[in-house]
Amino acid sequence: MTKLIVRTALLTLLTCLTSIISKAQIGYDYARYDVGFSLGFNQFYGDVVTAKSTKGVNFNFNYNQSPFINYIFEAQFGKLAGGDAINDPLGRQFAADYQYYALRLQLQAGELIDYSGNGLANALKNLYIGSGVGIIYSKISSINRYSVQFPGYYTPGLDKTSQIFVPVRIGYEFKIFNKYQRPDIKIDVGYQYNAVFGDELDGFNSGHLNDAYSQFVIGVKFSIGEVTSYRKQINF
């Protein structure tokens, strides 16, 4: 009888402790991994005069060292375009399909600041900067190399290229918390500048500056897999 009472008491105590510990973790937990996708609105900078807006779609996998330090592998597919064969003096105009693969580190302000008890700091904690490295493949789908205004003028270049690039990004991640105060859905809004180590992303090899393109990006991420705890409360 005594053993039964002791066993029941220990079991009750263990249950209470487990409940207390569990409740203590509410607001501290986050998932180690995210998967997501985004839509980007592109603008190209290179050897053409007239800018044109195009789109790209991004798929990403994230490893979260913390809620505010993220290692991101991403694949992006889209189109780039620019120029005007008739009105631009050198007649350059192109359209290209591209795909890129990149690794990027993202650091959010919440990793560096104390946002507890401060409304402004709490709002700024999801602001982030990031950079990395990747490779971009482009294939020209249409191009004009001859000038209408200067007959005989021709701009050389390649129709297919693969080049290293560096993405630099700034943005804000809106975290949506579940009933356990865990950030399970994230809305990502950002601006990304992709600096290419080469001059033929547009199919033209004529300038002394490398090509680049910028993006306004909006996307969503979903948490998956293992859940762990952060050193401080995530949501206030």
What are these regions (language model features)?
Residues Q25-R32, F68, E111-K125, I176-I185, ...:
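Short loop/turn motifs that connect adjacent beta-strands in outer-membrane beta-barrel proteins
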Residues F37-F41, F59-Y63, L103-L107, S131-I135, ...:
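Residues on the lipid-exposed face of transmembrane beta-strands in outer-membrane beta-barrel proteins
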Residues I69-Q149:
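Gram-negative (and chloroplast) outer-membrane scaffold detector with strong preference
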Residues F44-D47, D84-Y98, G117, G152-L158, ...:
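Extracellular loop and loop/strand-boundary signature of outer-membrane beta-barrel proteins
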Residues Y98, F174-F236:
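Predominantly the C-terminal beta-signal and adjacent terminal strand-loop region
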